[in-house]
Amino acid sequence: MPESKYRQQTIRAPRGATLTAKSWLTEAPLRMLMNNLDPDVAENPHELVVYGGIGRAARNWECYDAIVDALTRLEADETLLIQSGKPVGVFKTHDNAPRVLIANSNLVPHWATWEHFNELDAKGLAMYGQMTAGSWIYIGSQGIVQGTYETFVEAGRQHYNGTLAGRWVLTAGLGGMGGAQPLAATLAGACSLTIECQQSRIDFRLRTRYVDEQAATLDDALARIAHYTRAGKAVSVALCANAADILPELVNRGVRPDLVTDQTSAHDPLHGYLPTGWRWEEYQEKALSDPQGTMQAAKRSMAAHVQAMLAFSKMGVPTFDYGNNIRQMAKEMGVENAFDFPGFVPAYIRPLFCRGIGPFRWVALSGDPQDIYKTDAKVKEIVAEDKHLHHWLDMARERIHFQGLPARICWVGLEWRQKLGLAFNEMVRCGEVSAPIVIGRDHLDSGSVASPNRETEAMRDGSDAVSDWPLLNALLNTASGATWVSLHHGGGVGMGFSQHAGMVIVCDGTDEAAARIRRVLHNDPATGVMRHADAGYDLAVECAVEQGLHLPMVAATQRKR
């Protein structure tokens, strides 16, 4: 039977406290795999695409069926191995080993190109896992809302005396990641104009309240933005158009936004960025009939897009790359100064990473939103003094639409992750929530990624491209007993530009789970503090000392013998 990437099937994760697998440690990855393909979550579930161009949850439908069958049958002392979305083996391990180990999209560096990957993909030998698509912990656009919110808030602190009121953000892309931008801007107090070339994506964001309004034309959009900024209102506006047309036009008109960024799927020129003048259907057809020509056309449009961003930057508008590698694509097309504006991590986020603060997330396997609201309250109780975090949780409850199983994103660091995990496990044990909770994170975290054009751009010691760190993170999480661990290549910025690791752990209310949580939710963020301390960041060294880390080559953390 030929392998199929298309099936007209609606998948939703089971809800409630009844198991379909043999334990919660195997039920959890089963439900989260299915949740990734829920039509309320995934961008194109019938083709197994979760987000980010062609980021898939399984290699093909036959592999999906086999994964579901394997997880249903998996014993408490067995581990399932997934190779680029394909279940390749079940092995006897032990009770505290991960139940699933995942490796997606990894290629020997010399061959780590889109061209070679696409050849393998066409032969059914590989799958692009993005970050949380192939690692089964995607929670919809909420997963990046807080990180984007924190970025915008910090930009307001740095450039506009601490407030974005009466300001507006210009950006593009309303896909799985980019769709978070308008809501994040609104929560940060700013208006936003987001350019998106697919009407279906705008419709989805309007329906889920991530976007407030759609403008009919550019003039209409600018009039709305002018009206709302004068009134001091934070309203998000979408425009169906091509960013490679609109941004240069805005430059020509002398329009001056207050912040400029971008979250189109520029990391994947074959599937993720519509060339100017093309229809989406034409783009899809030519991706098959003329892949090289299609990629070149997309990159030419990206070059025009980046040149406009450079022009805004030259005007003095704070302009930053939001991690889609569009600067690299433009540079390959001859825009030699493409990197004259920074990425968002060195510009705004790195101090958080130095303290192990990153995108901690959890999901209620029950499917009951009340379980998330109860955990929100528990977070406020434990992290009692962080009013900024409390404000985020209040806004999230009011504005964020759950996609699939109810979930929450909450940026916390080394000091708090273990404490929160243990508290959630106790809530499960006592019956305060109606079923177990899974805790995971984005691969975009402080110690789990090497990505010189994004998370590890401009490291103090020049170690941007050293990818030992995510490998060590994956190995340590495996040794610590995470429920499933993943190691991917190419997420966010595309083939050849990143390696990254993920972990998920189940809170099932048992003492054994508590022991695993103590190890995993300390060690995982501690690798981020370690990585930044090793690179020479004083803030990370201070955090390492405060949290009692032993880093043999960092003098301040030496243990007295």
UniProtKB/Swiss-Prot annotation:
The reaction(s) this protein catalyses: 4-imidazolone-5-propanoate = trans-urocanate + H2O
Pathway involvement of the protein, from the record: Amino-acid degradation; L-histidine degradation into L-glutamate; N-formimidoyl-L-glutamate from L-histidine: step 2/3
Main localization category: cytoplasm
Residues that bind NAD(+): 52-53, 130, 176-178, 196, 201, 242-243, 263-267, 273-274, 322, 492
EC number(s) from the headed UniProt entry: 4.2.1.49
GO biological process: L-histidine catabolic process to glutamate and formamide; L-histidine catabolic process to glutamate and formate
Molecular function as annotated in GO: urocanate hydratase activity
PROSITE patterns in alphabetical order: UROCANASE
Superkingdom classification of source: Bacteria
Free-text cofactor note: Binds 1 NAD(+) per subunit.
Obligatory cofactor(s): NAD(+)
Gene3D superfamilies registered for this protein in UniProt: Urocanase like domains (3.40.50.10730), Urocanase superfamily (3.40.1770.10)
KW NAD (keyword) present: yes
InterPro entries: Urocanase (IPR055351), Urocanase-like (IPR023637), Urocanase_C (IPR035401), Urocanase_central_sf (IPR038364), Urocanase_CS (IPR023636), Urocanase_N (IPR035400), Urocanase_Rossmann-like (IPR035085), Urocanase_sf (IPR036190)
UniProt xrefs under Pfam families: Urocanase, Urocanase_C, Urocanase_N
One cellular component (GO) term of this entry: cytoplasm
Subcellular location: Cytoplasm
Active-site residue list: 410
Keyword annotations of the record: Cytoplasm, Histidine metabolism, Lyase, NAD
HAMAP family, per the entry: HutU (MF_00577)
Family stated for the protein in its record: Belongs to the urocanase family.
Function text: Catalyzes the conversion of urocanate to 4-imidazolone-5-propionate.
UniProt-recorded name of the protein: Urocanate hydratase
Species per Swiss-Prot/TrEMBL record: Salmonella arizonae (strain ATCC BAA-731 / CDC346-86 / RSK2980)
Gene behind the chain: hutU
